[in-house]
Amino acid sequence: MADAGIPDEILYSDISDDEIIIDGDGDSSGDEDDDDGGLTRQAAARIVTDLGFEVLQPLQSGSEGRVFVARRPGEADTVVLKVGQKPSTLMEGMLLQRLSHDNVMRMKQMLARGPATCLVLPHFRCDLYSYLTMRDGPLDMRDAGCVIRAVLRGLAYLHGMRIMHRDVKAENIFLEDVDTVCLGDLGAARCNVAAPNFYGLAGTIETNAPEVLARDRYDTKVDVWGAGVVLFETLAYPKTITGGDEPAINGEMHLIDLIRALGVHPEEFPPDTRLRSEFVRYAGTHRQPYTQYARVARLGLPETGAFLIYKMLTFDPVRRPSADEILNFGMWTV
């Protein structure tokens, strides 16, 4: 657990500079003062106050709105308020109203003030990225298994409702401890996903699945890939899946780095896709197809963890197991 004296701005990590939301014609990223259609942090704080809350601490804003730790005067419990005036904030709130699962963020309330929507959310101790940073070391297999199993349970629930999260990463996984884990931030989620299609670019480059980066058709299996990257990061911290220390320049460069780092074999590329036609030339034959990735094998990770990472990071999404299928693997002991 994190030290109780650590302030929230440390317990909650920054939004990645490489977060992308490009769905249709929109494009949002970063934390500029007008990144929510002109809703400044000061204006959002006034909305929070007008709604009867006391702002305790601003958190790093994302592409979908301003975020604060707050509480109602006279109440001890704190909450996280997400304030935005883009349609996506309202849509996220409407989606959260439909959800009820222990491993998916439960919205307490949705409020409106003029054109702005305010989501009242639980205040967790920290996010997984910050938890790993404060530990300054990887988790053991027991703790990593607890975290990723909870994430997979949340994903299985969402996928059963035909909801695709599209931004599974350590920053969007919230916890009190490794036994109390919740998947949050559904601002990039897509509903009514019945079959693979190109639903636009969304999420974060470093955790995007290859089919997203290649702009191919995709479905809920992209969330399994993101969870696989998270599992790698929890077991191999501070190493990254590509071995690079700098953020990806763009999606295509990250995809090339990924193919090379994992040692993806040409036979593992899905047929009749842009992924194969445009990127198979970066593959190698030094590794047998459908065996453990070179990048993972070199690190000496726990055998169970290495197996799960390989399955979740199966390059061809058709071969990649679903969250439900992984949860039914016989190796779970946590």
UniProtKB/Swiss-Prot annotation:
Enzyme Commission number: 2.7.11.1
Annotated GO biological process: regulation of G2/M transition of mitotic cell cycle; regulation of gene expression; signal transduction
Keyword set, alphabetical order: ATP-binding, Kinase, Nucleotide-binding, Serine/threonine-protein kinase, Transferase
SUPFAM superfamilies attached to this UniProt entry: Protein kinase-like (PK-like)
InterPro entries referenced in this protein's UniProt entry, alphabetically: CDK (IPR050108), Kinase-like_dom_sf (IPR011009), Prot_kinase_dom (IPR000719), Ser/Thr_kinase_AS (IPR008271)
Catalytic activity: L-seryl-[protein] + ATP = O-phospho-L-seryl-[protein] + ADP + H(+); L-threonyl-[protein] + ATP = O-phospho-L-threonyl-[protein] + ADP + H(+)
Residues annotated to bind ATP: 59-67, 82
Domain called Protein kinase: residue spans: 53-333
SMART domains to which the protein is assigned, alphabetical: S_TKc
Matching Pfam families: Pkinase (PF00069)
Active site location: 167
GO MF term list: ATP binding; cyclin binding; cyclin-dependent protein serine/threonine kinase activity; protein serine kinase activity
GO cellular component terms attached to this protein's record: cyclin-dependent protein kinase holoenzyme complex
Function summary: Able to phosphorylate in vitro the major virion phosphoprotein phosphorylated in vivo.
Assigned protein family: Belongs to the protein kinase superfamily. Ser/Thr protein kinase family.
Protein name as catalogued: Serine/threonine-protein kinase
Naturally occurring in which organism (per UniProt): Suid herpesvirus 1 (strain Kaplan) (SuHV-1)
Designated gene of the protein: PK
